[in-house]
Curated annotation (Swiss-Prot):
Its cofactor is [4Fe-4S] cluster; S-adenosyl-L-methionine. Involved in repair of UV radiation-induced DNA damage during spore germination. Can repair thymine dimer 5-thyminyl-5,6-dihydrothymine (known as spore photoproduct (SP)) by in situ monomerization of SP to two thymines. This is Spore photoproduct lyase. It is an enzyme of class 4 (lyase). Residues 217-234 bind DNA. InterPro entries: rSAM (IPR007197), SPL (IPR049539), SPL_Bacilli (IPR034560), SPL_firmicutes (IPR023897). [4Fe-4S] cluster binds at residues 90, 94, 97. It catalyses: (5R)-5,6-dihydro-5-(thymidin-7-yl)thymidine in DNA = a thymidine dimer in DNA. Residues 76-304 form the Radical SAM core domain. It comes from Geobacillus sp. (strain Y412MC61). GO terms for molecular function: 4 iron, 4 sulfur cluster binding; DNA binding; DNA photolyase activity; metal ion binding; S-adenosyl-L-methionine binding. CDD domains: Radical_SAM (cd01335). One of its GO terms (cellular component) is endospore-forming forespore.
Length: 341
């Protein structure tokens, strides 16, 4: 698929006082993209659309260039100690995505230009924990790879972490646009993960993302560039024929990764879950979705901040975990399963 290009761009005035802000302003001006001003990346008004659904879809192709003022990093367990905030929002239209509710009324994509401030804060966290390793997740609230061909913020983060003694970087993507990252000086300190799923899930619930085959071609490229490789199987979803669907996923993964060094391969396994607010938003934004959001079939699990979520019942969740682990053991016997949640 073609790399993401926004249809509309907003700038905070302060963003233009940073080199990246100036560079992006010149780039989008040359591309002929409409540019507007906003007082804050948190308060973007005037996104076009006659209905809420139309405004939502237009917001997904709107980029906001701003300054990150909150420099206290969120926790990102179990993936990493901290989430490093390079961007917020995503151009994809995955029906199940938790950003549907965490970003709520702000589904536009935000990128932050004060990278030196962000990296300085990351260095403080690294120094506090040294000599322990400190891991940073760069894709907690965005698919950073999908927009990085425009900003190169992720590339700078890879090289910043690559130069540290005790920092490590990780991120996950559904996009194939990795070429500009292949020559980054990562020094083996970045784990590049791809989100994969059964054909059913990708075909029905992941519009606006790269195909499975394109993701795998990109995975071969990044492995060839010496990055540590990982796969996030998420969300693991019990559709009709799911056992066969996920078997074919791992079988095809093994086939397409033949000849790649998989000595340090990782898998992360995340079952499908949703909240009541998410269900409302998903059904509003994707009224024809085939996603099964029937609470009566699920177990209610309390989460952080008192917000509960619906996950599979214990027996079904165990069956999912055991099945995935058995497929991984068969096709990738030396891989590490980092967690199932």
């Amino acid at each position: 698929m073609k790399p993401f290009v926004p249809k509309l761009v907003y700038f905070e005035p302060e963003a233009l006082s940073y080199p990246l802000g100036q560079e992006l302003y010149e780039k989008f001006t040359q591309m002929g993209i409409e540019i507007r001003e906003t007082t804050s990346h948190n308060q973007v008004r005037g996104i076009p659309g006659e209905t809420e659904l139309a405004r939502y879809r237009n917001a997904k192709s709107t980029l906001v260039v701003g300054v990150r003022r909150t420099l206290k990093f969120d926790s990102s367990k179990p993936s990493a100690e901290y989430a490093i905030p390079l961007a917020t929002g995503c151009m994809g239209h995955c029906h199940y995505c938790y950003l549907q509710t965490t970003l709520g009324s702000k589904p536009y994509i935000r990128v932050y230009v004060n990278l030196d401030d962000i990296f300085a804060q990351a260095q403080k966290y690294i120094d506090e924990r040294a000599p322990e390793i400190t891991r940073f997740e760069a894709a907690c609230t965005s698919d950073i790879v999908g927009i990085d061909h425009l900003t190169h913020s992720l590339k700078k983060a890879i090289e910043f972490i690559g130069a540290t003694d005790y920092g490590r970087l990780r991120f996950v993507t559904k996009y194939e646009h990795v070429d500009h990252l292949l020559d980054a000086k990562h020094n083996g300190k970045t784990r590049f993960r791809f989100s994969v799923n059964s054909r059913y899930v990708i075909n029905h619930f992941e519009p606006g993302t790269s195909s499975f085959d394109a993701r795998l071609q990109a995975a071969r490229k990044v492995a060839g560039a010496g990055y540590k490789l990982g796969f996030v199987v998420a969300p693991i979803y019990r559709h009709d024929g799911w056992e066969q669907g996920y078997f074919e996923l791992f079988q095809e993964l093994a086939r397409q990764l033949e000849g790649v060094d998989l000595s340090d391969l990782t898998f992360e396994l995340i079952q499908h879950r949703f909240t009541k607010p998410a269900k409302r938003v998903i059904e509003q934004r994707y009224p024809k979705t085939k996603l099964d959001l029937d609470e009566s079939k699920r177990k209610y699990k309390w989460g952080r901040y008192g917000i509960g979520k619906y996950v599979y019942r214990d027996k079904e969740a165990r069956e999912l975990e055991e099945t995935m682990r058995s497929y991984i053991a068969r096709f990738f016997p030396s891989a590490q399963v980092q967690y199932f949640t």
